[in-house]
A protein has these predicted regions:
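Active-/binding-site microenvironments in catalytic and ligand-binding cores
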Residues: 1-217
């Protein structure tokens, strides 16, 4: 189903798409997926129905909150790794629907114990209640400013006006990102570093999770 407007995030950059329900005069259906085609967002319904006319999309608030917490947590981890490990870049990221995530970094010489020790400063940032804001800069500025683009392989797509979205954590970090985040770091549950794996000669994989969810429930 294609709608004129939608409040749902289609996913990308390692973040899962929003979940929700579509309601219209003739019924309702869970939204099983979101797909971009022809520059428009299509809502894939879980049931074989025909929907038309005025419709209402309701996002799954609990799932979106979890994604916001997890995504903000990965930004904090990213910032601390970048600052403490010589500007190490991200080589991969994936957030999961059980409140866990993994981030891969180009860290061939890193001490895994020092990486595990980042759990305490991550949670200290949470306790500091730092504001999280978004601003837009030109592509040229994003590409020429050290540290704004942290991934070795991908960058958020520009807007129709050629601007790049930058997520700022007050006093801590600025980086390009198109996903959803908290308005304040204090709105997150604590985060635990679950495991660190060596993935090849260069990559270290850090697995983290929200305390109280999934394996940390």
């Amino acid at each position: 189903v294609r709608l004129k407007d939608s409040p749902l995030y289609p996913g990308g950059g390692g973040q899962l798409p929003d979940r929700g329900v579509l309601r219209w005069a003739g019924g309702e259906s869970a939204i099983a997926g979101l797909e971009m085609s022809g520059g428009r967002l299509w809502h894939v319904l879980a049931d074989p129905v025909e929907a038309s006319g005025v419709a209402l999309v309701e996002a799954d608030a609990a799932f979106r909150q979890m994604m916001r917490e997890m995504h903000t947590g990965t930004h904090i981890l990213n910032a601390l790794v970048f600052q403490n490990f010589d500007g190490a870049l991200v080589t991969g990221v994936q957030m999961n629907d059980d409140g866990t995530a993994r981030m891969d970094f180009d860290l061939p010489q890193a001490d895994n114990d020092k990486l595990r020790a980042l759990e305490a400063p991550i949670n200290e940032v949470m306790r500091q209640n730092l504001a999280v804001n978004c601003v837009y800069v030109t592509q040229e500025e994003a590409q020429s400013t050290p540290g704004l683009i942290r991934s070795r392989s991908v960058a958020p797509p520009p807007t129709d006006e050629g601007m790049i979205r930058i997520v700022e954590i007050e006093g801590l970090d600025r980086q390009a990102c198109g996903g959803t985040h908290l308005a304040n770091t204090g709105n997150s549950r604590p985060i635990s570093i679950l495991k660190i794996d060596n993935k090849g000669r260069h990559n270290r994989r850090i697995r983290l999770g929200l305390v109280g969810l999934g394996p940390l429930a």
